[in-house]
Amino acid sequence: MEENIFSSNQDIDAIDVEDSIKASYLDYSMSVIIGRALPDARDGLKPVHRRILYAMNDLGVGSRSPYKKSARIVGDVIGKYHPHGDTAVYDALVRMAQNFSMRVPAVDGQGNFGSVDGDGAAAMRYTEARMTVLAEELLRDLDKDTVDFIPNYDDSLSEPDVLPARVPNLLLNGSSGIAVGMATNIPPHSLDELVNGLLTLLDDKEVGLEDIMTHIKGPDFPTGGIIFGKKGIIEAYKTGRGRIKLRAKTHIEKKPNKDVIVVDELPYQVNKAKLHADIADLVKEKLIDGISEVRDESDRDGIRLVIELKRDAMSEIVLNNLFKSTQMEVTFGVIMLAINNKEPKVFSLLELLKLFLNHRKTVIIRRTIFELQKARARAHILEGLKIALDNIDAVINLIKTSADTNSARDGLMAKFGLSELQSNAILDMRLSKLTGLEREKLEAELKEILELIEKLDAILKSETLIENIIRDELLEIKSKFKCPRITDIVDDYDDIDVEDLIPNENMVVTITHRGYIKRVPSKSYEKQKRGGKGKVAVTTYDDDFIESFFTCMSHDTLMFVTDRGQLYWLKVYKIPEGSRTAKGKAVVNLISLQADEKIKAIIPTTDFDESKSLAFFTKNGIVKRTNLSEFKNIRSIGVKAINLDDNDELVTVVIANSEPDESYDDSFEDGEGVSNLQTISEDNSENSLESGKMLFAVTKKGMCIKFALNKVRQIGRVSRGVTAIRFKENLDEVVGAVVIENDSQEILSVSQKGIGKRTTADEYRLQSRGGKGVICMKLTPKTKDLVGVVMVDEEMDLMALTSSGKMIRVDMQSIRKAGRNTSGVIVVNVDGDEVVSIARCPKEESDDDDIVADDTQEQDME
């Protein structure tokens, strides 16, 4: 039978398990918080780091001493001060030796102490270590009773509760740790800036954060990088908590036909090898486009992660995607939590600076008291020796006649009024001290000691002198370490788009029948006079030809409308830039076109303002108007922009400011009921013009119609539209359309044979939508069919494209003005070729003014 361990008469206290667990967990929490995970606000060290440095100091491995095996150091730390696992202690030692972890390392390691690639250090039996100058500055004056000592874990030894720390180590090297219910993450800083900030605080106790930040600009990470924005820094310095955005530092190297992104500096605590692998994975999974190869060329001179781009990739866009998708951009969460007076607290920057200065003030006071006591003790001895020398004969006689040392000591104390210490010093004095030279040295030393006592006493009585000592020591530290900033701080990029990194230049965008697209700076095409023969705009495949082109800005958004009525988005700068004769890139690689889907219209726009609308014109004379804002949120698969009849296709789309819709007969919505429309008389034309803009459409057979924009009311994206013009000839079709602001504007029309003219808009009478129109250009075999129209603008040039792929730029003002019912003059000398498209482009300086143009006679067709 099992024996009952409790006797019947034994007193047993009942306890609540819940209360016991709470108390035990609280004790454990405080043990972790105070004794393990959080740094002291004064010296910036956790207990393990402090014990490592103290053990190294005991072993005498200073910055000028020989290296000592890491295993020996770890063994001393574990055996004397830190009864935990050797791995944890060695890891802490290793981190203090890594220049990519510490802004200024406290340990000088010899051997493999890890790398920025995440490689672990070699085993402690292979590596060696010693203290750096920084560690010596943290420990300086430790032997002068400057800090309190506490018993070690078994009360056999004592260890410092805090180090004297002549350096603001908490802010210099930062700290990170996870305790129970709390964590700290303090970033490192530049020592030069910290010293300047401390000196400013010494000079003005009431200085504000704004003034301090003129010196301490922000964190300074050992791996460099770029901090974006000061908002997070200010918040962290003000409240002790904040978020700092940190990016890798890169540069672009230009190579023939492609760019190379080179990463020079990494964000703090980013693993380079993992970053390399992550980028490679993103490229493999096609989550980032434009990268052909990633390789690591880092060496002892520094980091060099090379990212080679494809020929048509834009480095700015690829780099922006890398920042978004990888650890080339990270957020450093600041929590300035530290221990003060055995309590954890989140500190502001000013509080930490003041704590350090107060700590240094305490250290200097205790050091001064220690030195004063030592000086007074020495002066006391020297005064006794001086009395003995002044009475040397009597002293010698007394000693000679004394029975023993004790009687001699008592005799000296009684006869000359000396203390026991003084008497012992006299008895211990060598005979050589009786020489005249030694007497002079003694008197000089006494004088020097008395002056030192006076100086030390003055220091203790003057706070100003104490602050001057702190100031001098800080300046000494600054000159000794020379630690300039290596992390750049730039303006925040929250409001900066990738477009801000790309010049907003004039571009010519071309697209071929087979769907190859490219952009070329418009300055690549020199302006020529009328009749110029142009330059080759693109080299096409044998079965391909340029189908359309237009001019726009790099930052514009392109809206692609296809034969299926779908609309897609694409930024102009995302189109690969090519040479004037380059073939371009397949547009299916840029937007998500479906199989056999063909682009029919491309509309550039700078915004999606609700005050604007899109007017769609089809080959069969249908017009539809939809507010531009309907297309501002486009998915990658596109949206439906217009419903087309089976035998119809889109010709062009123009942008116009939205006008209030006028009421009209809904029977026109399907294109019927045209016979009910009445042509607006000339008298009513002006009144109608006052109400808003006009749409102007032209046909292949030289007809045109001008009607009020507000006669086409805005409808939804998936609607069909209404009739714009009825054709006189069966084979006729709409070939172009423009928006007219007022009747004083001029319209430029061009035919297939390069014949063109400028005509004022008031020569085309205003009609109701759905009419048959009037003659726009008199067509002859010499002119052939009409190609299109553009609005004349003195700030713009005309760009004409031929079927052979040639482009020519012509000054619009050089083209003769002619009436509505005329043919015009030669605008482009086609030499058997034909003009297939025209567009406007911004003016450029002409370098080709010697080209002579031929004119044709204007023909009156009225």
Curated annotation (Swiss-Prot):
A motif (GyrA-box) lies at residues 528-534. InterPro entries: GyrA (IPR005743), GyrA/parC_rep (IPR006691), Gyrase/topoIV_suA_C (IPR035516), Topo_IIA-like_dom_sf (IPR013760), Topo_IIA_A/C_ab (IPR013758), Topo_IIA_A_a_sf (IPR013757), Topo_IIA_dom_A (IPR002205), Type_II_DNA_Topoisomerases (IPR050220). Keywords: Antibiotic resistance, ATP-binding, Cytoplasm, DNA-binding, Isomerase, Nucleotide-binding, Topoisomerase. Belongs to the type II topoisomerase GyrA/ParC subunit family. SMART domains: TOP4c. A type II topoisomerase that negatively supercoils closed circular double-stranded (ds) DNA in an ATP-dependent manner to modulate DNA topology and maintain chromosomes in an underwound state. Negative supercoiling favors strand separation, and DNA replication, transcription, recombination and repair, all of which involve strand separation. Also able to catalyze the interconversion of other topological isomers of dsDNA rings, including catenanes and knotted rings. Type II topoisomerases break and join 2 DNA strands simultaneously in an ATP-dependent manner. Its EC number is 5.6.2.2. This is DNA gyrase subunit A. Heterotetramer, composed of two GyrA and two GyrB chains. In the heterotetramer, GyrA contains the active site tyrosine that forms a transient covalent intermediate with DNA, while GyrB binds cofactors and catalyzes ATP hydrolysis. Residues 843-862 are annotated as: Disordered. Coiled coil: none annotated. Few gyrases are as efficient as E.coli at forming negative supercoils. Not all organisms have 2 type II topoisomerases; in organisms with a single type II topoisomerase this enzyme also has to decatenate newly replicated chromosomes. It holds the Pfam family DNA_topoisoIV. One of its GO terms (biological process) is response to antibiotic. It catalyses: ATP-dependent breakage, passage and rejoining of double-stranded DNA. The active site is at Y126 (o-(5'-phospho-dna)-tyrosine intermediate). It is found in: Cytoplasm. It comes from Campylobacter fetus. Residues 38-501 form the Topo IIA-type catalytic domain. CDD domains: TOP4c. GO terms for cellular component: chromosome; cytoplasm; DNA topoisomerase type II (double strand cut, ATP-hydrolyzing) complex. One of its GO terms (molecular function) is DNA binding. Residues 845-862 have a biased composition (Acidic residues). Transmembrane segments: none annotated. Its main location: cytoplasm.
